[in-house]
Every structure is written in C-alpha cells, then in structure tokens.
From Swiss-Prot:
It holds the Pfam family Dicty_CAR. It is found in: Membrane. This is Cyclic AMP receptor 2. Residues 338-375 are annotated as: Disordered. It comes from Dictyostelium discoideum (Social amoeba). The modification Phosphoserine is found at S192, S298, S303.
Amino acid sequence: MTIMSDIIAQRTILLIADFSSIIGCSLVLIGFWRLKLLRNHITKIISLFCATSLFKDVISTIITLLYKPDQTESGFPCYLHAIVITFGSLACWLWTLMLSFSIYNLIVRREPEPERFEKFYFCLCYGLPLISTIVMLSTHIIQPVGGWCWIGDNYDGYRFGLFYGPFFFIWGTSAILVGLTSKYTYSVIRSSVSDNKDKHMTYQFKLINYIVVFLVCWVFAIVNRILNGLNQFPTVPNVLHTYFSVSHGFYASITFIYNNPLMWRYFGAKFLLIFSKFGLFVQAQQRLELNKNNNNPSPIMRSKNALDNGADSSVVELPCLSKADSLSLDAENNIETPKENENQNHHHHHHHHHHHNHYNNNNNNNNINNKNDMI
C-alpha cells in the first residue's frame, strides 16, 4: 500500500468517526436542551463534553473534506486542524476526568454540593488546553502528518509534553478514581441486606460506564504510542487508535442515551410519530409520548435529601444525585399510564417519609439497601 493510499484510508476512518460522533453528541445536546429532567450536575458535565467534542468534530470534518491529502505546506487549514486536535482533545479528556472526580465526590466523599466546583472545572478544562495550544503555535512545530496536521514527527518532546503527557495522567487518574468508586460501592452493596443487589450493581455500572468508555476508546492510543516508541508501526493498532480516539464522542453519547430512558423515550416517540401518520405503531408511539418525562428513580436512597432532612451523616450509603438531580440509572424502565404514574408518585412519597424516620432511628450501614428501596 502506498503512502497516498494510507493517507486516504486514514481520512476515510476520520470522516466515519467524526460523522458518528457529531450525530451522537448532537442527540445528547438536543435531549439536554429539550428535557429539563435531565439537567443536573453530572449531565451538565456530560453535555459540556459533548459540546466540546461536537465543536472539535465539526471543524475537523470540514477541514478533512476540504484539505488535500497531498498538501505538503502548512497553511491556515493545517494550523486550524492542529489547534482543534490539541485544544479539543485535551478539553474532552479533562471533562471526562472532571466527570470521574464528580462521581467519586458524590459516592465516596459524599459531597453535598458538587456544583460549587463547576467554575473550577471550566477554568481547568479550557485553560490548560489553551496553554498547550498557545505553546504549540508559538514554537512553529505544526506540520502535515499524514491525513491531518499536528505537531511534526521530529518533535517528540513537544508531543509528549503538550499532549501525551497530560493524556497519560488524565487516563491513569480516571482509572484510579473509577477503581476507588467501584471498590467502595461494591463493598457497600456486598455488606448490605438488600433484595435488590443486582439492580444496585446495575446502578453502579451506569455510574461509571462513561469513564469506562473513555478508558477503552483511548487504550488503543496508549498501546500504539508505546509500540511507536519501540520503533514499531503496525497497521492494526494505528487504525484502532485513529478510529476509537476520534469516535469517543459517539460511544459516550450512546452510553448517555442507554443510561437515560428519557432520551430513548423522547426520540422514540418522535421517530414513531412518522409511522403513526400511516397507522403504524400508534399505540407504541402514544405510550412513549405519555411516558417520555418518566425518568425512573434509582434503586438507591437519595442521600442528599436524607442528609438535608436531618438523617445521620454517619450512615454509609450509595448517594444518588438528589431528587432534582436524579439520573435514570435503574435496571428496569417500566412504562406506565399517567394514572399509574400518579399513584406510584404518591406511593413513593409515602415510602420516602418512612425511610427518613427509619434512618433517624437506626444507624446500621445495611439500611442503605433495605428491601423498601424499590425502583
């Protein structure tokens, strides 16, 4: 295969990954805009990640379509592509790290007001990438490197210092935070007396699967760069590195939609509306439309509400994100009629009051998962 064929193959992979990421991130942002029940501290971080990824992928796609693969001179499109890759990728990684930290903060450290860190997140997630980008531009090290433009092949020190060094740190720190969070939640679930342990494990998985997607999508980059450092340049790791690193936004978006029934009910109702005009899937469309705002609660007690209502802070539990902040992280997503939903809301309010009294009277750690914690 010639060098030009390699470049064309790289560009094709880039376009496929960029287009899929654009579609996925757009769906998440539309859902965040249209569905107010989705808006909380965690989903805000995810939406900012998606907005950053969308910005990066749109510009990258336009440049890839317009940029000639045989161009050898560094012009404005070349510099813009390098800026988008460096700034956009670093910002997306940092938003993922902030998501890892926020989940750890909520679950393990039991932070009652995670929103107070958001202003620092903004400064960090956009400030550090800006510094790396400015240094890259000021040192005149941008060159065409195959299917895109970036730091030239002869500047390994800059590549590591401005890009891969921060990446390895972010990847490793995210993995550690996921491990600590998983260890904590697993130990609490295992020591509980709940009849819903399977649902609690599903809840735990849905808390951390965003981070797992990040770790998996970028592990190929780590393997490929290690091989490159050993002066090995195999095709398969390079292709996997290119595809999964660029399509990270797509897989993160799919994970978000999977975690939130609001999303697939909302888009499902909109999609089936087309067929219902022709008398097809009418009942299914109506049921989704009626229940599109029914984001089922998690199987775990909402710790923030419990603490706000005076529950003993020494009780060990797996916190959700408060009533206003609850994500749909349940194992079963039952669709109900409006009447059934109203009855269940009244029933849930009664049980929430019962749990509050139960927590005040009993400080046993196993109370977090008693069998009244229903979905």
